[in-house]
Amino acid sequence: MAPKSSSSGSKKKSSASSNSADAKASKFKLPAEFITRPHPSKDHGKETCTAYIHPNVLSSLEINPGSFCTVGKIGENGILVIARAGDEEVHPVNVITLSTTIRSVGNLILGDRLELKKAQVQPPYATKVTVGSLQGYNILECMEEKVIQKLLDDSGVIMPGMIFQNLKTKAGDESIDVVITDASDDSLPDVSQLDLNMDDMYGGLDNLFYLSPPFIFRKGSTHITFSKETQANRKYNLPEPLSYAAVGGLDKEIESLKSAIEIPLHQPTLFSSFGVSPPRGILLHGPPGTGKTMLLRVVANTSNAHVLTINGPSIVSKYLGETEAALRDIFNEARKYQPSIIFIDEIDSIAPNRANDDSGEVESRVVATLLTLMDGMGAAGKVVVIAATNRPNSVDPALRRPGRFDQEVEIGIPDVDARFDILTKQFSRMSSDRHVLDSEAIKYIASKTHGYVGADLTALCRESVMKTIQRGLGTDANIDKFSLKVTLKDVESAMVDIRPSAMREIFLEMPKVYWSDIGGQEELKTKMKEMIQLPLEASETFARLGISAPKGVLLYGPPGCSKTLTAKALATESGINFLAVKGPEIFNKYVGESERAIREIFRKARSAAPSIIFFDEIDALSPDRDGSSTSAANHVLTSLLNEIDGVEELKGVVIVAATNRPDEIDAALLRPGRLDRHIYVGPPDVNARLEILKKCTKKFNTEESGVDLHELADRTEGYSGAEVVLLCQEAGLAAIMEDLDVAKVELRHFEKAFKGIARGITPEMLSYYEEFALRSGSSS
């Protein structure tokens, strides 16, 4: 029998190898997301718009090398790029490399997660492209037109928002950043004027709605124009480039972060030459909305580092060990793609204090893993961990020691200068012809937005625009949208709806009571303005003269004499953040909860400073410790004393307390430095009673009925303000009971009301308050 031919054997081998290749291809798993990494070659030239992708990924998505595809953040519009196959042996499967120029279009930073799609159609040829510079220079004075032409020709694909960085000028002694501000094709409709029912020659609107519309540059056919614009046309609605200049009110914090991040990332050997390891961790803490996350994005954009974000809840898994594995994967990626920054948002949620009762086994394992990973980063590595929290005391103390989170940077609530800076930057983003706010108007807004954080001010600007639009639509449905402008009145109207974040947890309706609503008591009103409004509104003058403002004011007097009403009017008229505290809400049956409630009230007041804390019936909260007060009441009083005048100074917060039993308040609370000023709010005099009667009877038609209000004012001698109001209400009720359609209230109705009202203020009561005034010696 003849032997088998070798050709038959080779066919079998060939078939086997083919099947092996097919099996290998079928086993390939397409990544769910891709990681942004920098371009392997220089950013300018023929590689500007190329994206290097693993060959197997291109095969799976049926994208041919050299054809168009789109990359973009997951769930967002993409950017058109030219696909190139990376080295199969070297290029990671889940990585897409992009040039700085392409990343600038979508504000992409290294480490961003991307999705990849095949482009359905070829972009149109551009008939016109407009070029500007980030510095606002006249480009033709700095560079030759042929240099720009070659730059765009090499790029091939152009789109608004592309930034070509660090281009040498004619002189060669400096560089500029060139930006494409606009591009168009005469055969296509203007992007800003597109109608949702329109279709176009390139395959429908879906193909036009990239993040930025792409065009092909054709040398000799595409006309180049030059502009002094510093950014892409607003009609494209591109993400705004993040830079330190865009952040308002955080100059000190920015300088601190720049030194703490950039040197360890890019020059860690400087530290090792001194025999010390560079700082590895930074803890940003401060109230929500102050700009912690925004600050990180700016640092990430400017430092050109690989950024990984850990959001507490997103990595927590119900399965044992998965959370720790996710943390290890993130730190491994950071070590692989150095220099890198790991940002942990809300770190208190994944690494709480292990000493807390509510901290379980899972939290303890996560904290232990995080400690191990931070210790294992090594002295020479270029990895920095930045964490953010608004509850720094809830973070495990082992993380806050040097060697882990070496530095702690507080991002506090902005002061008036910082608010002015933030508002100026916010309104500068609007076109100058869309608002009529000058520098003085913005200063006025900044002075009135006490306790507002950056996020609140952004919301205020947005709400102001809403008010402007509503005002325009209310007057004329066909109004020209370009004639609408944001005014100071719109901003003031928006301030009613947008409250400071620190005050949002306090469900307190701002009382709409004005000084004019309080009959008489002119001396009391003047004293309250002098002692409370003036120090808060003119704090700089007080500091310059070395005068300390009163810490607190005690309003005491008989019941019904407008003590609480005065506090409400003060809150409304001053425009200052107002916190009202009711005694029964403070006391809690659980040990320590009442004291915690007091601390929380003062914390909120400090956050929203300048502010007023109003304690109504304060004698219930601070009974005399020499009397029959309980242990719980003593603990609350001690907390109150410490908060008002303890080790931590109370700045920008004034205490207003009201009581009708001043001698039952503990003496320690009444001393100077706490409730320094005592104001007696006595029964209204004849003029004050007349004012109250006029306010309460203005709809009684007393002129027709012949009721003499002066006589009624004399007859109500010794009545409290509340009793005078009750007299009017009872008289009105008597008139209605006589006739449901009554038009006027007559004297007989008042006579009937007098019979049902007894004076609540006795001579003994008045002498009691006089004795207290003599004993305290600080009545005003």
UniProtKB/Swiss-Prot annotation:
The hexamer is activated by RLP24 during pre-60S ribosomal particle maturation; RLP24 activates ATPase activity of both ATP-binding regions and increases cooperativity between AFG2 subunits. The second ATP-binding region is inhibited by diazaborine; the inhibition requires prior ATP binding specifically to the second ATP-binding region. This is ATPase family gene 2 protein. Homohexamer; ATP binding induces oligomerization. Forms a ring-shaped particle of about 12 nm diameter, that displays 6-fold radial symmetry. Associates with cytoplasmic pre-60S ribosomal particles containing ARX1, ALB1, RLP24 and NOG1. Binds to pre-60S ribosomal particles soon after their export from the nucleus and is released before REI1 and LSG1 are incorporated into the particles. Hexameric form interacts with RLP24 (via C-terminal); the interaction recruits AFG2 to pre-60S ribosomal particles and promotes AFG2 ATPase activity and RLP24 release from pre-60S ribosomal particles. It is found in: Cytoplasm. Keywords: ATP-binding, Chaperone, Cytoplasm, Hydrolase, Nucleotide-binding, Repeat, Ribosome biogenesis. GO terms for cellular component: cytoplasm; preribosome, large subunit precursor. It catalyses: ATP + H2O = ADP + phosphate + H(+). GO terms for molecular function: ATP binding; ATP hydrolysis activity.
